Amino acid sequence: MLTLSKQTDYALLALTYLSAAGRAANTKEIAEQHDIPIELLAKILQKLTRAGLLTSAPGPTGRYRLARSPGTVTIGEVVKLIDGPPALAQCMRPENAVCGQQEKCTIRAPLAAINARIMLLLDHITLAEIEIGRAHV
C-alpha cells in the first residue's frame, strides 16, 4: 500500500506549523511542538529550503519561514521532494522498471492509472487546505 515516510509526515507538520504561525520559527521550536527528532528535522528543513519552499536566516539560531503562499504549496510537491514519486507497486519504482512479468502482467496498467490519479489528487491539495482542515478529496 502507498505509505508516506515519516520524513514526509515531519515535512508536512513543519510546513503547516510555519503556515499557521504566520511567522518565522527555528528548528528547535518546531521539533518541540511536534516531538520530532531535531537532527532529522534540521535535514528536512534544509531540503525544503533548497527546493524553495522555505527561506532561512543564517546562523545557529536561524529561523525558517514559508517562501511561498500556503495556497501554492501542494502536498504532492512535498511528497515527491521528500520520498520521490509514489508507487503502488514495486515495478513502478524507477529502480525496478524492468520486470520479468511485464509481458504477461495484467495489473501494471490499471495500477499505473490509479497511481496517476492519487498523484493528481495530491497535486491539487494545498498546504492552506490542510492547515484549515478543508482538503477536498
Kindly give the residue locations of the regions a language model identified:
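Non-DNA-binding regulatory cores of transcription-related proteins
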Residues: 67-134
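Basic amphipathic alpha-helical segments that dock to polyanions
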Residues: 18, 44-49
